[in-house]
Amino acid sequence: MSKVRVYEYAKEHQVSSKKVIEALKDLGIEVANHMSTINENALRQLDNAVDGTNKKAEAPKKETTSNENGNSKGPNKPNMTNSNEKSNKPNKPAGQANKPATANKSQGAKPATNKPANTSNQTQSSGTQQQAGGQKRNNSNRPGGGNSNRPGGNNRPNRGGNFNNKGRNTKKKGKLNHSTVPPTPPKPKELPEKIVFSESLTVAELAKKLYREPSELIKKLFMLGVVATINQSLDKDAIELICDDYGVQVEEEIKVDVTDLDVYFENELNEAVDESKLVERPPVVTIMGHVDHGKTTLLDSLRNTKVTLGEAGGITQHIGAYQLEIHDKKITFLDTPGHAAFTAMRARGAQITDITILVVAADDGVMPQTIEAINHAKAAGMPIIVAVNKIDKPQANPDRVMQELTEYELVPEAWGGDTIFAPISAKFGEGLENLLDMILLVSEVEELKANPDRRAIGSVIEAELDKGRGPVATLLVQDGTLNIGDPIVVGNTFGRVRAMVNDLGRRVKKVGPSTPVEITGLNDVPQAGDRFVVFEDEKTARNIGETRASRALVAQRSATNRVSLDNLFEHMKAGEMKEVNVIIKADVQGSVEALAASLRKIDVEGVNVKIIHTAVGAINESDITLAAASNAIVIGFNVRPTAQAREAAENESVDIRLHRVIYKAIDEIEAAMKGMLDPEFQEKIIGQAQVRQTINVSKVGTIAGCYVTDGKITRDSGVRIIRDGIVVFEGEIATLKRFKDDAKEVAKGYECGITVQNFNDIKEDDVIEAYVMEEIERK
């Protein structure tokens, strides 16, 4: 037999290690602790002591069964004392057995019945109870008989007896023996009718939802061909397999990321609500048009204020939001500072306006910004009402305006179209009532409704940092009601609404749908076009705002994946595009029309070219803004982009393609749509110089005295001569000098002399653009 540790022996006999150590000490065997080992001799002595104790416990049980008086404590005395071992007085212990308390009567027999295996040793004893008792005394006193005559010696064997079943710890021992009886398995709970989960569940989580043991689910999964552990995540298919086996329905919950305000905003805006809670809301109207055609004067006449007089040059300096009340109905007007801000809002996905009023001067007709406004409104998908202004002037010709607008698919109702035309005089107030009636008519057709009983959502019209009040934002509530004290997230900022001021400069406590209001209380300045959402508590708003701010900091407002000719074929293959948006700028109107007509004929695999804007002149920043909002490609024919436009295109990742031959532009776009573009040389603009003075020298030609305004001019670079935004010549530099010395390059801020090969028609204020060709490979 191998050595056994104390704690192992105690565990095997279901007693504490302390009692085993005490029993070994009674046998004269010293052990240090529960980790000590018991050798074979000591183990044999300990087993004999245990066997003897078990026999002592069994003897009272046998006598109890034959005792008619039911006195179960009679034979217990031989186990309690070992000093009195006379064989001629077998009945004396029985007489002394009546002294102990009767509380141990039922506990004395229980341990004996719990150790049936130990009773097998009694077959070797004699047939009488006295002989059995004598055997017990001999077994228990043999290891330590020398200690039987000292004081307190009677308790020594009794301590050994306590090691098994007797004494004051019998109750505790009884509890230990009771725990060995296998408990009745609990009745399993009824299966639920349906469980709801999002994304995935672990085996343990699914077992908890089904009120089943994880091991049961693991077995079922194994039988279904899925090997999984208790902490392994299960996909939707595995969850459905298990639940189908149990007959439980499964529902997947789609969680909306509240930090993604755009998605959350759309879900909240399109949330199904009780029709009885919806009320009619005022329409939001944007006034657009060419410079000095009377946009602000119109709004001024409607509000009976003199806003125009306080503005420099009659140009609106900030975004104004005003609300008017006509015939007991309200209309919200937005006055935009040009179309850039409007386009920027649309580029961020903020569809805040319902109706567009296009102001056209009757004496001026359709102008370039008028066309831009039409393209913006059409791209946003808004209904257009044309206000023909300045009809009071003698040279006014409204019919000419209508005729010109038909070219842009704005056909008057009087001519069989669906566009409302309203002749007005903003200065004298003529026709304004009719215009307002038309606005209310269109809004009634659109069925504009909102729920004022919900938490507010909307968009930012403008924002600024005020020295006295801190971050200030002008908001347009699109749905719900905004109250003072509401926790709010605005774009990447957050806070609590501290104060609200309406368009009349009065403090208000709450505002409803389609109402503009200026608020304070944000931690930072948001951007125009940002969404705002009111949340239930400030803690949630703070967490969402901080999360969005940290994400924005990491992303650094990374540019979206704009469409370019390089990746056009990939977008088409992925099925992301049904049409290619193109903006065309050229030197003359004839080139614009020819190029647009040729591009419209291109059709590759059902994808065609859509011309969203055409104009004559250099590519400007407004073109880039429109291209960024519409995900369009800009094509320039015999024109160049301005420095601001080039910088904006780089920031917005807008693709600009410049050509001097029409068929090359057409071939390039068609090849891109077919995915057949080969590696090519890319042009890199390295600098620009302005011609300050020209000197004609015989045998040399015209020397241009230039000042480098951007980048640098190098001796081996190609150059273009640009006059009024139009390329007049393209060639190479013949000489580049500085202070009569040849120079390899001249940097920004320095003057130089330049002659161009085969070109002497250089004039003052011309721009010399230097470029180099770099070989690139299409991605």
Swiss-Prot record:
Region (Disordered): 44-193
Composition-biased stretches (Basic and acidic residues): 53-65
Region ranges (G3): 335-338
List of residues binding GTP: 289-296, 335-339, 389-392
Keyword vocabulary terms for this entry: Cytoplasm, GTP-binding, Initiation factor, Nucleotide-binding, Protein biosynthesis
Pfam families, alphabetized: EF-G_D2, GTP_EFTU, IF-2, IF2_N
GO biological process, one term: translational initiation
Residues annotated as transmembrane: none
CDD domains listed in its UniProt record: IF2_eIF5B, IF2_mtIF2_II, mtIF2_IVc
UniProt-annotated stretches for the region G2: 314-318
Biased composition (Polar residues): 66-81
Annotated localization: Cytoplasm
Regions of compositional bias (Low complexity) in chain numbering: 82-93, 117-167
InterPro entries associated with the record: EF-G-like_DII, IF2_II, IF2_N, P-loop_NTPase, Small_GTP-bd, T_Tr_GTP-bd_dom, TF_IF2_bacterial-like, TIF_IF2
Gene Ontology CC annotations of this record: cytoplasm; cytosol
Chain segments carrying region G5: 425-427
Domain of life: Bacteria
Record region (G1): 289-296
Spans annotated as G4: 389-392
Domain tr-type G: 280-449
Keyword Protein biosynthesis: yes
HAMAP family: IF_2_B
Recorded family membership: Belongs to the TRAFAC class translation factor GTPase superfamily. Classic translation factor GTPase family. IF-2 subfamily.
Cited function: One of the essential components for the initiation of protein synthesis. Protects formylmethionyl-tRNA from spontaneous hydrolysis and promotes its binding to the 30S ribosomal subunits. Also involved in the hydrolysis of GTP during the formation of the 70S ribosomal complex.
Protein name stated in the entry: Translation initiation factor IF-2
Source organism: Listeria monocytogenes serovar 1/2a (strain ATCC BAA-679 / EGD-e)
